[in-house]
């Protein structure tokens, strides 16, 4: 039997830091001169050493919901982790995993039948046979009842550095007499004791020694998260009178852990810091979900963000792309900007697009397609007709390079050639064009003003890029065969448009999609950055404000005789005059010549 830890030395060293964490959580305010109280709680046959307790007034039901959410999303407590895959579960109560599966099913049902069929075929043929996972037996804890058992696999971000680890999570609950006391209070029946309810989760990794534990996991054999919630009895009258139940309940949150035999005499600063952070994240997340100022977080659905593509697929593809391309791109980067920001951002976008195209078209990366051909000559995986892509304002071209290297045909263009283009293979450089795209509506106006077609290298029709006939499973982009001229307006009608930080062309992205195929516009992906208007000028769009109701300000809405007041009319006229003056001072047409004149006039007022 392991003995309780002697925490006095660690407490004296880390006293101020522990109090800082408590103040951040805003759970209790204790004077710094007061000593930190620790207690050893023996809930099991083995004595567990507890961390610092924090007083809280959060209901155990809310704590339990948050514990389930953090159990499925360990990345909130450790930046090293991606996610947790649920391998097995048992119990009666629904979990957030079930809610997530239900939400994903609703999203799939809303998609088209063709896309669903392709996605289902791909997913079914990609399923791997998983090894059976043995569940660690649950402990019998006095006063607690086993509520649910989950077996999860912690997936790290860098699996070449950290290994995944399986973990059995036992969820216990103890309602106590709180519900009964509440009913008795409504009926006016006196009470003789202060009730409590408790919630507990025990995490046990599937390892035989601490050497098998990865870096991100605390060096403990097992860990128990305990939350006790109840009412404090306050006596009134004689000594033997019935206690009055306080209106404000109190909760106590603590973490108990079972150390290894060689670590029972001390607690490392890293372990103490990790356990304290677990409590802090638990409280902060629970309070955030219950914050009335953020009603959207009160629903479990609001916490689920991967409604388009399942998170595990995007993360696995991102890890594969990062291991394949990140090091090489960072080493060969020749731009003056920081490579890590651009490289990893484009890798994540590429991972999302690859999984999106898998569902939309049934197209898979080239390596995966070759593996499927070797395994089965009759396999249909990856045989979907991919229409090709175009990356407008492609910038450094990293996204185009990754997608082409993964076997997806397409091309990109930008107004200025970038240094990064030179580090790519020749076939990729041929698909990166230095062009300026002027939308067709503007070219029609210019052509009408000049009474004839304009021969200018900056016009839409000048973007000549030969296309070849699509091959089986793919379609080729520009510069891959014949010399047929094309432009953005003459691209294949199903071309997928990528608008990644396209600035002036961001608003034009859905319009370009509609111009390609008005009857059935192709899908596109727009990731906005700087805000511009359709004219190309910088413009910040203000959010639409809700109109005040007539019951809130009736005097401003209507005068005594049923007409608008004179003050309102005067203010509206003044507003129109001010807007007219601002319009004259600040041209919004994108006229560079006029803007330059205004700038020179401001610099030389005399």
Curated annotation (Swiss-Prot):
It is found in: Cytoplasm. Its EC number is 2.1.1.211. Probable adenosyl-L-methionine (AdoMet)-dependent tRNA (uracil-O(2)-)-methyltransferase. It holds the Pfam family AdoMet_MTase. It is an enzyme of class 2 (transferase). Residues 455-489, 537-606 are annotated as: Disordered. The lineage of its organism: Eukaryota, Fungi, Dikarya, Ascomycota, Pezizomycotina. Residues 470-489 have a biased composition (Low complexity). This is tRNA (uracil-O(2)-)-methyltransferase. It catalyses: uridine(44) in tRNA(Ser) + S-adenosyl-L-methionine = 2'-O-methyluridine(44) in tRNA(Ser) + S-adenosyl-L-homocysteine + H(+). One of its GO terms (biological process) is tRNA methylation. GO terms for molecular function: tRNA (uridine) methyltransferase activity; tRNA(Ser) (uridine(44)-2'-O-)-methyltransferase activity. InterPro entries: tRNA_uracil_MeTrfase. GO terms for cellular component: cytoplasm. Its main location: cytoplasm. Residues 573-600 have a biased composition (Basic and acidic residues). Residues 455-469, 546-564 have a biased composition (Polar residues). Belongs to the TRM44 family. Keywords: Cytoplasm, Methyltransferase, S-adenosyl-L-methionine, Transferase, tRNA processing.
